[in-house]
Amino acid sequence: MRVGVICFANTCRSPVAESLLVRFLAGEDGIEVFSRGVAGGPGSTPEAMLQALTQNGLSLVSVSGEQLVNDDLNADLYLFMERSILREAVVRNPSMWPKSFTMREFARRAQLNPPERDSETFAEWLAVVHSTRRREELLGTDSEDDVRDPGLGGDLEAFSAMISELELLSHRVAQLLTGWPSK
């Protein structure tokens, strides 16, 4: 199973979520997690974020600023940090829609449709989770499902809050990704 975690520049939120998912999925065979940005490029990690990571006993698996490209379109699940970023990716690549969610949305919808690992595959379950959605939900500016971006000017408190939120979400998501039969 391939899981992509996507934010804007791939220098803050998605690398943190990737690192947390890798930590929570340690020992689980067959799951690859990667992070990308929709506007990736060389970027540096803000100093306040590095301090927040250290205070939380975390380190990053990768910080590349790498952009989402066609080679990444074979993932089984995409978890976005914001609805606007999800919308942009789906406009560029409509085939991503059934397997693309904001991280918060995925955790919420999955809780309403718990997996039945002994009677369905991950892809079948994901189709059930997706079936209650409408494309129109991508429109608008509601940020309810967004993970707030502290940005390059964010302070230690803002990055610590982001890390705490992503830790909770990553733990929930990791529980949903484990225990599936091998293909």
Predicted regions and their residues:
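Conserved active-site segments centered on acidic
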Residues: M1-A75, S84-P98, H171, Q175-K183
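Phosphate-binding/catalytic loops
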Residues: V90-K183
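Short secondary-structure boundary segments
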Residues: E82-R83, R104
